[in-house]
Each structure stands twice: as C-alpha cells, then as structure tokens.
Amino acid sequence: MATNAKPVYQRILLKLSGEALQGTEGFGIDASILDRMAQEVKELVELGIQVGVVIGGGNLFRGAGLAKAGMNRVVGDHMGMLATVMNGLAMRDALHRAYVNARLMSAIPLNGVCDNYSWAEAISLLRNNRVVIFSAGTGNPFFTTDSAACLRGIEIEADVVLKATKVDGVYSADPVQDPSATMYETLTYQDVLERELKVMDLAAFTLARDHNLPIRVFNMNKPGALRRVVMGEKEGTLISQ
C-alpha cells in the first residue's frame, strides 16, 4: 500500500489510558513503556505534527472500588485527578529526556508542580511545536478522562482524537470473549450508538459527535502504530460523521 509523503493530520489530541503506562505490571508506571511512548510522540513532533496529550490515572488510582466501599464520589474523583497529574509529570519527564519540549497543564491549580490550564497558552505552545500534556481531567468530578480528551480536543481544534487502547480497534464484540468478533475500519457516530459499541463513555462520545470531532481507536502496544495512523495508513478504527 502506498503511503502518504506527509502526515494527514496537523494537530492531534492523543488519549492514553493510565493502564497503558503500567505495561505488564498490575500497578504503577513501567519505565520502558513510558520511554517508548515518549519516543513515538517525538516522531510525531519531528514530522511537524502538533501534539496534545491526555493521560488517564487508572494505573495509580481507581475510585470506583472505594466509592462502593463508601468513599464520597467527589473525593474519589479528586484523587483520580491527582493520579493523572502524576502520570503527566512522568510523561513530561520522559519527553524532556528524549529532548522534546513539553509543558504540563493541570485543570486544578497545583502551583510549583505544573502550569494552570490556559486555552490561549496551550494554543500558543502547540503552534510553537511544544507538546502539551493536559492533566486533572476536566477539573470536575463525574467526568472521565475520555471526556477531558474530547473537551481539550475541541478546544484546541484538533483534527482528531487518537484513543490508544490495548486492542487493534473497535470490534463487533469483545474479541477476547468472542473469537468471531470482527474489527471495523470505519464507523459513523450513529453506527456506534445504534450498535451500542463500547468506544468511550456516552458523555465523551456525544461531545465529540456534536462537535464533529473524529475519533480513531488504535493499539498503542503495536510498535509504529501511532506513526502509521498519522500518515494515513490502514490502522485502527476511524469514527466520524
């Protein structure tokens, strides 16, 4: 298959799950995975692509279990936000070690640790080829980091949200439980809703749909997959109008 000489996207929002950073470990951050992801982001920057990043916090903290045990949901979500800041600090450090200029912004004030989120500042940094990592979700409880990814993607006018997962794309059923499940190359927003496919939570998904923000789901564990996506090669599942 012929490949494009130039990237098909100019500005992207990369959504990484916290679990992706833990690798085969059950908890925490796998340094080798972190460094590999930083190198893949570096490749995009070298291609001239402007990169925003949102990282989840599930590798460090999961509020759902504690909520069932009686913890207040708001408190649990605030703890989850802090977990995303910790992951953001790790990613910023990995990018700096890879000689990539990166800035970490938080939706909740953490002076002395990272910058407060500023839309105008984020746009300026992206235009100057700085990677911008958006942490602390939306800054509000009850919203997932997928919602934060779509919100920031819309705000920075990203061409696409690239949702990195552990599977190759969106399947008709869970491929682990159903070997006959087929992977979709393209879907419309309506297809996803009608078939009740699990791409991201409904609040996040409808936000993307209402603002016509395409979503591409792909497997970040496949070496080179991120580069293939931005070069327009056949990789993952694209969801659009």
Swiss-Prot record:
It comes from Pectobacterium atrosepticum (strain SCRI 1043 / ATCC BAA-672) (Erwinia carotovora subsp. atroseptica). The gene is pyrH. UMP binds at G57, D77, T138, G139, N140, P141, F142, F143, T144, T145. Pathway: Pyrimidine metabolism; CTP biosynthesis via de novo pathway; UDP from UMP (UMPK route): step 1/1. Its EC number is 2.7.4.22. It is found in: Cytoplasm. This is Uridylate kinase. PANTHER family: URIDYLATE KINASE (PTHR42833), URIDYLATE KINASE PUMPKIN, CHLOROPLASTIC (PTHR42833:SF4). One of its GO terms (molecular function) is UMP kinase activity. Catalyzes the reversible phosphorylation of UMP to UDP.
